[in-house]
């Protein structure tokens, strides 16, 4: 049984293509005999605090944190415990204005913590989150894979790698806003990528 943490960050609710892809992926795992323990974090509903100077320093261990900062530390610890307790991380990361949703960035700002999920050395940071693989489901209105306009892929690889998560796969649903056939073609291509992951 795999312990799966799902992060949904689309602002489109039930119309979200990344959430639909994740739900389909999980349903197919179940159909294939996997009895997974799944935790779903809807980051839009969670309304995570945005990193500012107060929270930044509190999460790095500053003395005498305010009540607000203490709540953020407790939340950060909870999110990190969920992450470290997982075997597989599924991330819904639609592209908004060439980048990840703010809600997803807020989650990473709470879990990427020095001395907790990574540590500094004399050369490079070393990740402290071990034994977890990740699959990112990313929908886009245009076609961006392999282009300078794709800031989503390098950012997610880098921030996951910072914490030690280096086994990362991507499922892209691209060109969804391109007429007349982009939507159907983009989802069909994502479907093929998902099939390859199940193989």
Curated annotation (Swiss-Prot):
In terms of domain of life, where is this protein from? Bacteria
EC no. given is 1.6.5.-, 1.7.1.17
Alphabetically list the UniProt keywords. Answer: Flavoprotein, FMN, NAD, Oxidoreductase
Cofactors named for this entry:
FMN
Give GO MF terms, alphabetically: electron transfer activity; FMN binding; oxidoreductase activity, acting on NAD(P)H as acceptor; oxidoreductase activity, acting on NAD(P)H, quinone or similar compound as acceptor
InterPro entries for this protein:
Flavodoxin_fold, Flavoprotein-like_sf, FMN-dep_NADH:Q_OxRdtase_AzoR1, NADH:quinone_OxRdtase_FMN_depd
Entry note: cofactor: Binds 1 FMN per subunit.
Annotated coiled-coil positions are none
- Catalysed reactions, as listed in the record: 2 a quinone + NADH + H(+) = 2 a 1,4-benzosemiquinone + NAD(+); N,N-dimethyl-1,4-phenylenediamine + anthranilate + 2 NAD(+) = 2-(4-dimethylaminophenyl)diazenylbenzoate + 2 NADH + 2 H(+)
Q: Does the keyword Lyase apply?
A: no
For FMN, which residues are the binding ones? Answer: 10, 95-98, 139-142
Q: What does this protein do?
A: Quinone reductase that provides resistance to thiol-specific stress caused by electrophilic quinones. Also exhibits azoreductase activity. Catalyzes the reductive cleavage of the azo bond in aromatic azo compounds to the corresponding amines.
- Describe the family membership recorded for this protein in Swiss-Prot or TrEMBL: Belongs to the azoreductase type 1 family.
Subunit structure, as described in the record: Homodimer.
Could you tell me what this protein is called?
A: FMN-dependent NADH:quinone oxidoreductase 4
Gene for this protein? azoR4
């Amino acid at each position: 049984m795999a312990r799966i943490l799902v992060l949904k960050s689309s602002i489109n609710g039930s119309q979200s293509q990344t959430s639909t892809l994740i739900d389909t992926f999980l349903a197919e795992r179940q159909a294939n005999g996997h009895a997974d323990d799944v935790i779903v974090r809807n980051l839009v509903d969670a309304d995570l605090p945005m990193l500012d100077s107060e929270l930044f320093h509190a999460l790095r261990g500053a003395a005498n944190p305010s009540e607000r900062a203490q709540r953020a530390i407790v939340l950060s610890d909870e999110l990190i415990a969920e992450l470290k307790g997982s075997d597989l991380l599924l991330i819904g990361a639609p592209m908004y204005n060439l980048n990840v949703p703010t809600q997803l960035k807020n989650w990473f700002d709470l879990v990427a913590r020095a001395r907790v999920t990574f540590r500094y050395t004399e050369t490079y940071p070393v990740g402290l989150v071990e034994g977890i693989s990740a699959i990112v489901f990313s929908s886009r209105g245009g076609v961006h894979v392999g282009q300078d306009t794709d800031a989503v892929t390098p950012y997610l690889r880098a921030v996951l790698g910072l914490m030690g998560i280096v086994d990362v796969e991507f499922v892209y649903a691209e060109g969804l806003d391109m007429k007349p056939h982009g939507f159907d073609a983009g989802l069909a291509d994502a479907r093929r990528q998902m099939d390859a992951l199940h193989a």
